[in-house]
C-alpha cells in the first residue's frame, strides 16, 4: 500500500495519525498492523497496530496489539513520505486516509526481488491495465514486471500480467507471459483495475506509473 494522497498533512506525505482503519477484522480485538518500508523494502519503523476495543475505550495506533504500549510522541510523530510503501496485515480491514483523494500521477517502485510488493489503484476511479506503464532499471530478464490483481480477500483474481520491453523485438506493453508471445485476450484495455483495488507486483527496481485520474 502507498499513502500518496493530496491534502493529507502536506503534498509530500502524511502522518500516521492521518490514517484510520475501518471494516470487519479477522484479527483479535480488531487490530491492523502497519510497517513503513525503506526504499530498499526493509522495515523502517514499527510495526504499529490499529486497536479498536470499545469496552476498554481504546481506539488508535499503538506499539502492540493489546493497546497497552503507546507510540512515543503519538501517531502524529510518525511520518509517511508521499509514495512510501507500507506493509499491512489485517484481512478485510480498510486503511482510510484523511483529506482529498489523489488527483495526480502516482509512481510505485517495486523493492522486492524475491517476494511481491503490495501496490494498488489509489485513484478514485477505475483504470485499465493499458494505462499503466513501467520504467526503471530491472533485475528481471528483458525488463519484465509481473502484476497480479487481487480480490478484496487478497487472493489472485486475474493475471499474472507481464510488462515486456524488448526493443530488439519491437515489443513493449502488457502480455500474458514474460517472453511477450502471448497476447491478453481483448488487449490490456480489457483488464479493469477498480478504484482502491490492490495488486501484487514483482520486479525489483522497476517503477509502475499510474496516470492522473480523469475526474468528472
Regions found by a protein language model. Give the residues of each.
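N-terminal exported-region signature
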Residues: 1-216
Amino acid at each position: 500500500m502507498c499513502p500518496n494522497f493530496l491534502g493529507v498533512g502536506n503534498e509530500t506525505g502524511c502522518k500516521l495519525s492521518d490514517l484510520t482503519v475501518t471494516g470487519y477484522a479477522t484479527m483479535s480485538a480488531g487490530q491492523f498492523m502497519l510497517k513503513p518500508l525503506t526504499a530498499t523494502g526493509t522495515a523502517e519503523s514499527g510495526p504499529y497496530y490499529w486497536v479498536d476495543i470499545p469496552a476498554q475505550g481504546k481506539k488508535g495506533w499503538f506499539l502492540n496489539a493489546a493497546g497497552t504500549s503507546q507510540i512515543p510522541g503519538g501517531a502524529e510523530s510518525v511520518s509517511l513520505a508521499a509514495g512510501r510503501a507500507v506493509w499491512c496485515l489485517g484481512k478485510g480491514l480498510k486503511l482510510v486516509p484523511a483529506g482529498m483523494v489523489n488527483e495526480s500521477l502516482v509512481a510505485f517502485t517495486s523493492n522486492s526481488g524475491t517476494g511481491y510488493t503490495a501496490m494498488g489503484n489509489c485513484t478514485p476511479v477505475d483504470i485499465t491495465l493499458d494505462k499503466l506503464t513501467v520504467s526503471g532499471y530491472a533485475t528481471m530478464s528483458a525488463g519484465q514486471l509481473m502484476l497480479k490483481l487481487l480480490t478484496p480477500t487478497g487472493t489472485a483474481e486475474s493475471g499474472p500480467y507481464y510488462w515486456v520491453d524488448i526493443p530488439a523485438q519491437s515489443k513493449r506493453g502488457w502480455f500474458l507471459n514474460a517472453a511477450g508471445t502471448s497476447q491478453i485476450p481483448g488487449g490490456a484495455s480489457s483488464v479493469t483495475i477498480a478504484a482502491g483495488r490492490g495488486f501484487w507486483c514483482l520486479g525489483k527496481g522497476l517503477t509502475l506509473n499510474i496516470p492522473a485520474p480523469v475526474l468528472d
